[in-house]
Amino acid sequence: MAFPPRRRLRLGPRGLPLLLSGLLLPLCRAFNLDVDSPAEYSGPEGSYFGFAVDFFVPSASSRMFLLVGAPKANTTQPGIVEGGQVLKCDWSSTRRCQPIEFDATGNRDYAKDDPLEFKSHQWFGASVRSKQDKILACAPLYHWRTEMKQEREPVGTCFLQDGTKTVEYAPCRSQDIDADGQGFCQGGFSIDFTKADRVLLGGPGSFYWQGQLISDQVAEIVSKYDPNVYSIKYNNQLATRTAQAIFDDSYLGYSVAVGDFNGDGIDDFVSGVPRAARTLGMVYIYDGKNMSSLYNFTGEQMAAYFGFSVAATDINGDDYADVFIGAPLFMDRGSDGKLQEVGQVSVSLQRASGDFQTTKLNGFEVFARFGSAIAPLGDLDQDGFNDIAIAAPYGGEDKKGIVYIFNGRSTGLNAVPSQILEGQWAARSMPPSFGYSMKGATDIDKNGYPDLIVGAFGVDRAILYRARPVITVNAGLEVYPSILNQDNKTCSLPGTALKVSCFNVRFCLKADGKGVLPRKLNFQVELLLDKLKQKGAIRRALFLYSRSPSHSKNMTISRGGLMQCEELIAYLRDESEFRDKLTPITIFMEYRLDYRTAADTTGLQPILNQFTPANISRQAHILLDCGEDNVCKPKLEVSVDSDQKKIYIGDDNPLTLIVKAQNQGEGAYEAELIVSIPLQADFIGVVRNNEALARLSCAFKTENQTRQVVCDLGNPMKAGTQLLAGLRFSVHQQSEMDTSVKFDLQIQSSNLFDKVSPVVSHKVDLAVLAAVEIRGVSSPDHVFLPIPNWEHKENPETEEDVGPVVQHIYELRNNGPSSFSKAMLHLQWPYKYNNNTLLYILHYDIDGPMNCTSDMEINPLRIKISSLQTTEKNDTVAGQGERDHLITKRDLALSEGDIHTLGCGVAQCLKIVCQVGRLDRGKSAILYVKSLLWTETFMNKENQNHSYSLKSSASFNVIEFPYKNLPIEDITNSTLVTTNVTWGIQPAPMPVPVWVIILAVLAGLLLLAVLVFVMYRMGFFKRVRPPQEEQEREQLQPHENGEGNSET
C-alpha cells in the first residue's frame, strides 16, 4: 500500500497568490502560435471527436500525425453501439482522418447468449497517448463479468499498438472483483508513458473508489499478450493497493503525469486525487521504481476538485520538474465580497533540496472551469524556458472556450498570459468545450518550434496551432549632435540659399532567430522627427532633402549577420516658426517585418519577439540662453486681489481678480497663468479699459473636469518680467452649502526644473441678502352708506343679505437676491366691536407656497358665496390701484373727530397664521381674504352718520434660510390695510354738455382739412412713375386716356 505520505505539502497561506484581474487580459498580445490559419479537423457528429488528443510521430516514417479520440463514435465491430474510435489525422494540407483499427471483434461470450464482455458505450478513445511507434488508447467504461457472477463491472480496458502489433491491456480485469476490489476500476481513465517505456494507468474506481495507479512495461505487455487469457499477470507491475476505509471515494488515478522528482533519472508518477482529504483534494507523487510515496500536495478549499488535472515540466530552467495542479471549481471572492467560481491552478516549483515553492493562478471568468486541462508546451518561443497551456473550456464569448498560454522564466511562470486562444465554434446540444483536451511539446512541422493540439469535443473538432518562428531584432538609433544650436547654421536647404541648423540621424538593424527561417529578412523602417508633438502640430525638425518629418526605408537584413546601418541629415526649423524651445525633440524609429516574404513553404509566417520592443527613440535638445548647463531655472510667483469682499448668494455678482505675475529667475518657456475657477463662476473676459493692466490673451477650457482660464505670459517669460492683469468673472451659481468661492492660481511653464509657481488660492466670502417686503390693499377701499335697497334680514343666507364685499389682499415678496426657505405671516382681522360684527370673513385663498390656519371658524353662518367675484384672485397687488373700484371715491371734508378707527387695539380680532415656504428672488406669496361688511352694525341709529376706518394688519418674520453655514440677520416687517366706511350720498357722474361734443367734432374736421392742404401743396398726391420704354408708353397711353381697344 502506497497511500501514507512521506511528506505532505499543504497549499495554504504560505503560497504566493498571483491574483490576476481581468483588466490585464487586453494587454496580452498574440505571440507565436498561429491563430490566423490553424489546421482544423472534424469527426463524426456527436462522436465527441476531440475528447482526447495527442501527436503521433512514428520513428520509421517521415510523416507525422495527430491522434484524436472519439469515444462515442460507432465502429464496424459487430453488435457494438458507440464503441468509440481513435482516428489518425494527417497534419498536412489534406487534413484527412482515418480510424485506427485496434479491435475489430464484437463481444466475446462464455457460451451463446452468455456474454463475457460489453463493448457498447465503452468510451474507447476517452484517453489516448503515444510515444514514438507506440499508441495506448483506452475504454474506461468497458464492462465484463466473471462466469460465476451476472453483474457487469466497469473494469475498463486499453489497447496498445507497438509498431505493427496491437494487444489488449486490461490490468483491472482480474479475479479481484466487486467494488472492494478492481470491479469498478475504470482502468484507462487517465494514462501516460514514461521515458523508460512504461505505461502509467489510472483507475479511480478501484477499492471502493479509493482509486489505483498501475504501471507496466510496454515490452512485457506485448510479449505476454494472449487473446485467450482474460486476466494476465505481469511480473514487473507496479501498483498501489487498497488502503483503510478513510481513503474511500478519493479517486486516485483521476489524472496522471510523469516526471523525475527525486533525481534518479527515472520518471516518477504524479496523480490527482480530487476527493481526498474530505474533498479538499490531493496530489500524490510516487517513486517510479517501486511505487512508494514521495510527496503529497493538499488543496485548501473543499469541493474545488483540486487534482482534476495535473502536469509536470521544468518551467524555470533549473532541471527540476515542477508540478501544475488544476482545481477548476475553486471559488474566490469577487469585488462585491461574494464567492464565485473562477478556477485555480497551483504552480509548485521544485527546488534542489526537494522542497516546493507554490504560487497560484486564479481564473479570469466565472464558471469558465479554469484549470480543467493543463498541457506542457515545451519551449514554445525558444527563449530557453518551457511554457505551458491552461484551459478554461467554458470561458470566453458565449462560453466557447479559452486556452491561455503562459511563458516560463527563471523566476517561475509569468503570471500574465502571453497569448489567448479563443474557441470559434458555437454550441450545439452542448458547449463546444474548447480546451477540454490539449497536447503540446511536439514539433509536427519540423520548423524547430513545438506545436499544440486543442480538442473541442462538443463540436467534434480538433485544432492544430503551429508555432511561428521567432525573430529577435536589435535596433540602434543615434542622434548627433544632441544639443542643437539655432545660431549654428552650417547646412543649406537644397535648391535655396537658406542656411539651417542641422544634425545627423543614424539608424541600424540586426536580426536573428532559431529554427527554419529565410536567409534574408525584409524590414520596413519608419523614422519620425519630433514624435511627441500631436498630430497637426508644427514639428520643429525636418529631414533635409525631403523637408518632411518622416522617412520610410526598406532594409534587407541577413539573418545572423552584422548590424546594418544608414544615415540621414535633418535640420531645425527657424525659431519664428514654433514656440516650444524647451521640450526635447524626440526622434522615433519603428520597424516592421515583411511577413509575406518571410513565410515558409506552407505559408507559416515568422513573428517578431514580443519581448523585444519594435521601436526605439532618442532625444535632441535646443540650445537655450540658460547658462552653461543649458537648463533654465525660473522663479515664478503669482499674487491676487479682488474688487469685491463679499458676494451675495443669488445675485449676478461681477467679480474682478487683479493678478500679479512675475519671474525672478531665468527664462520660463511657454509660460501660462492657470486660473482654476469654481463651478459657481463663469469667465467673462480680460479687463481692457484700464491702461495700467496688461491685456493678456486668455481662453477658457476644461481639463480633467477642471474648469480653467489659461493666459499666455510669453515664450519665454523673460527674467525680471512683471505683469498686472484683470480677469472678470460672474459668480451666480452658488449652492446652499457654500460659504465661499475659491480661485486657484498658478504659473506653469514647460521648463524641466522649477517649472511652476506655488499655487495661490483666493477666497471670496458668500453672504445672504434677502430684501423681503409685505404690502396690502383693500378692494374697495371705500364703502358708502346707506346701501341702496338693502333690507335687514334676521337670518341672512346670501352675500346681499349681509352687505357689500370687502377684500384685503396681502403680498409677501422676496426681492432677493438670496432665497429664504421659511417665514411666518401673522394676520389680525377686525371681526367684532361691542359684540357687533364688523367684517365677516367668507373665506380666504392663497397663491404661492403658503399654508394658513385661523383661531376662529370661518363663515360660521354658512352664507352662500357668490360665484361672481368683485376682484380676481390672480390680480397682482401692484395692479389693484389701476382697477376701477365698484364704489368710487368722492371728496369728503371730514375731520379727524368724525372718523372712528376700528383696529385690533379697539375691536376684537380674528387671527390667521400662515407658514410661507421657500421664496426665491422675485417670487411672491399672496393671501386673499374675502369678507362682507356687516351692514346691520353700521345701520344702527347710534352708528349712523359716522365714518369708520376698519384696519387689518399683517406682519412677517423670516425664520429659516437654505444656507446652512452662513450668518443671517433677522428679517421682519408689517403693514396695515384700511377700508373706510362713510355715511353720505355717492355723487352721480356729471354728463358731458352737448356743445362740448359739437365743438370737439368741428375742431377735428378743421385739423384734418389743414393737413390735407399742406400735403397737397407738397406734391404728396402726385403719382410718380419709373422710366418706361417708348413702346410701353404707346401701349399704355390709350388705356390711360380711356380710348384704347383690346388689340395689342
Swiss-Prot record:
Keyword tags: Calcium, Cell adhesion, Cell junction, Cell membrane, Cleavage on pair of basic residues, Disulfide bond, Glycoprotein, Host cell receptor for virus entry, Host-virus interaction, Integrin, Membrane, Metal-binding, Receptor, Repeat, Signal, Transmembrane, Transmembrane helix
Chief location bin: membrane
Motif (GFFKR motif): 1019-1023
GO cellular component: alphav-beta3 integrin-HMGB1 complex; alphav-beta3 integrin-IGF-1-IGF1R complex; alphav-beta3 integrin-PKCalpha complex; cell surface; cytosol; external side of plasma membrane; extracellular exosome; filopodium membrane
Xref: Pfam families: FG-GAP, Integrin_A_Ig_1, Integrin_A_Ig_2, Integrin_A_Ig_3, Integrin_alpha
Extracellular side: 31-992
Disordered: annotated segments: 1027-1048
Membrane topology: Single-pass type I membrane protein
One GO molecular-function entry: metal ion binding
Residues annotated to bind Ca(2+) 1: D260, N262, D264, I266, D268
Amino-acid positions noted as binding Ca(2+) 4 in the UniProt annotation, renumbered to this chain: D443, D445, N447, Y449, D451
GO biological process: angiogenesis; apolipoprotein A-I-mediated signaling pathway; apoptotic cell clearance; calcium ion transmembrane transport; cell adhesion; cell adhesion mediated by integrin; cell migration; cell-cell adhesion
Subcellular location: Cell membrane; Cell junction, Focal adhesion
Glycosylation sites per record: N74, N290, N296, N488, N554, N615, N704, N835, N851, N874, N945, N973, N980
Spans through the membrane: 993-1016
Binding residues for Ca(2+) 3: D379, D381, D383, F385, D387
FG-GAP repeat copies, ranges: 32-98, 109-170, 173-225, 237-291, 292-357, 358-415, 419-482
Signal peptide (residue range): 1-30
InterPro entries assigned to the protein according to its UniProt record, in alphabetical order: FG-GAP (IPR013517), Int_alpha_beta-p (IPR013519), Integrin_alpha (IPR000413), Integrin_alpha_C_CS (IPR018184), Integrin_alpha_Ig-like_1 (IPR013649), Integrin_alpha_Ig-like_2 (IPR048285), Integrin_alpha_Ig-like_3 (IPR048286), Integrin_alpha_N (IPR028994)
Basic and acidic residues composition bias: residue spans: 1027-1042
PANTHER family: INTEGRIN ALPHA, INTEGRIN ALPHA-V
Family: Belongs to the integrin alpha chain family.
Miscellaneous section: The constitutive activation of ITGAV:ITGB3 on neoplastic cells may contribute to tumor growth and metastatic potential.
Function: The alpha-V (ITGAV) integrins are receptors for vitronectin, cytotactin, fibronectin, fibrinogen, laminin, matrix metalloproteinase-2, osteopontin, osteomodulin, prothrombin, thrombospondin and vWF. They recognize the sequence R-G-D in a wide array of ligands. ITGAV:ITGB3 binds to fractalkine (CX3CL1) and may act as its coreceptor in CX3CR1-dependent fractalkine signaling. ITGAV:ITGB3 binds to NRG1 (via EGF domain) and this binding is essential for NRG1-ERBB signaling. ITGAV:ITGB3 binds to FGF1 and this binding is essential for FGF1 signaling. (Microbial infection) Integrin ITGAV:ITGB5 acts as a receptor for Adenovirus type C.
Subunit record text: Heterodimer of an alpha and a beta subunit. The alpha subunit is composed of a heavy and a light chain linked by a disulfide bond. Alpha-V (ITGAV) associates with either beta-1 (ITGB1), beta-3 (ITGB3), beta-5 (ITGB5), beta-6 (ITGB6) or beta-8 (ITGB8). Interacts with CIB1. Interacts with RAB25. Integrins ITGAV:ITGB3 and ITGAV:ITGB5 interact with FBLN5 (via N-terminus). ITGAV:ITGB3 and ITGAV:ITGB5 interact with CCN3. ITGAV:ITGB3 interacts with ADGRA2. ITGAV:ITGB3 interacts with FGF2; it is likely that FGF2 can simultaneously bind ITGAV:ITGB3 and FGF receptors. ITGAV:ITGB3 interacts with IL1B.
Name of the protein: Integrin alpha-V
